């Protein structure tokens, strides 16, 4: 999406007038050859936009001409501009010409040969490089660009009948990864299935506590489902992740392209014990992207609803729901005035309040996102900052020597030893002095974050209104399992095997400790607050970790450092919502009746990752992730991790090291 506040001169490179986005078409005289080429490129984009094309999402003739104009330009601006559009040529789909547009059809009929066909000028899927021969005239065709298969004009029975729906694919299956010195591109496709949720209704549901000491929760369940791409294992195969963490010192996502295509809407017909699934060529599915984050967040880290790791697994989309209020503060007990005031402020979000597409069988849609986030650093510190010195050189620093309650020992000052020089750098913050409140099965954390309005009636204690602040160790060494990140590899409702417990990363800027002296000994400081000169590294992620988390919208905040190592973003990718269209059917008593339908199709997700290869002066070999650290399992205990057994069961990792964490291999010089 374009920026809310566009700068008058655009976001151009320093010293340039046209080399960059969002600048006006007339911004003065170009400063050099690269700027002149950028001005011509902007004018070509303007013509494409006026003709109904979107040149920003697709590689086009103007981009190719810009690259050709700068092929002999070695200025800094020319190199940056040419490199950007070469990357776009490598990863973006091509904007088709008239001849190619005629090849794309949607068939809106069944076996009737005279049924009406409608055209769709969408580009071909994938990130194939556009050849010179394919970059031809890109003026708009006589038909409307991006036209969808429309209703009406179809003959024959709807919902299958004797014939079946016939159509041309709106995209192929994409997969695999590409590794370069500067970028890594991951491409994945999954078959998904979405069904009718909640009988097309919104409902307020009370989620009962799992224990007497737990919390109840109020939830608004909706008729919508959604796509969640927020996990590294959804995009990187184990081998790709091994290569990424072995060869690159840091990486971060830069752009994501999602395509939902080859939609097939089916009607479920039950006749006694028999069930028939017929094509429904007139039914629709609602799809839109919440790019402005106007609705409550759905992609919470560590949820099970992410895109499946295995390409052949069907992705059954989860139902969307959200929490409108802290239930304990809105129970209206004893006509409490505070709770009544809170209850009267409860919001109600209906997703139908947004514009969105309604697609039919055979149609497709696409979404593009840009990331603005920090790097994931993959280097480990082999020493702490306090040892960044030469131990062979004497120091001018001196220290005071206490007589230690011995009157015969005089107080004195002595020169500090060359190998024990003091440091200016302190450990990072963290909290380790608390424990979970029992019983053992309670839904609590060692620390609880709660909102407690004055005079509100609270029966369940802090566990009923708070959220577990977990794990709260910050950068400190965890003292027990209550301060370690743990997760299950198996889905909810199955046996709880595959429990992963994080280990120490062996990096000297993690798992730190601060000790306080008291004349005779040193005691551990369990709670360390924020001070100047604190130095620490981000929590080491694994392939099983989430990629991002959304920063809450607030007026103030301190240093943002999620405890699981995820990338905190102000604007992460917007949630893509989807639901089945409601098709009413007549009934004798005007009951709320509708067709029973579901939708399946393909969804592809392509992410461009910015990377930096490692370079080192270290003479010795370094540790790398290999297969020798994996396990053996399966039905007959014969199959290695990341393989399948005779029953088709996928052998998942059982330890933290098997998940190939970062910050365990490449040494960095502080």
UniProtKB/Swiss-Prot annotation:
CC per GO annotation: host cell cytoplasm; host cell nucleus; T=1 icosahedral viral capsid
EC number of the protein: 3.1.1.4
Alphabetical UniProt keywords: Capsid protein, Host cytoplasm, Host nucleus, Hydrolase, Lipid degradation, Lipid metabolism, T=1 icosahedral capsid protein, Virion
GO annotation (BP), single: lipid catabolic process
Sequence segments annotated as region (Disordered): 106-162
Pfam families: Parvo_coat, Phospholip_A2_4
Catalytic activity: a 1,2-diacyl-sn-glycero-3-phosphocholine + H2O = a 1-acyl-sn-glycero-3-phosphocholine + a fatty acid + H(+)
Hydrolase listed as a keyword: yes
Biased composition range(s): Gly residues: 147-162
Record bears the keyword Protein biosynthesis: no
Domain of life, per lineage: Viruses
Residues spanned by motif Nuclear localization signal: 613-624
Domain notes per entry: The N-terminus of Isoform Minor capsid protein VP1, VP1u, contains a phospholipase A2-like region. VP1u may play a role in the disruption of host tight junctions in the airway tract.
Similarity remark: Belongs to the parvoviridae capsid protein family.
Name of this protein: Minor capsid protein VP1
Organism: Human bocavirus 4
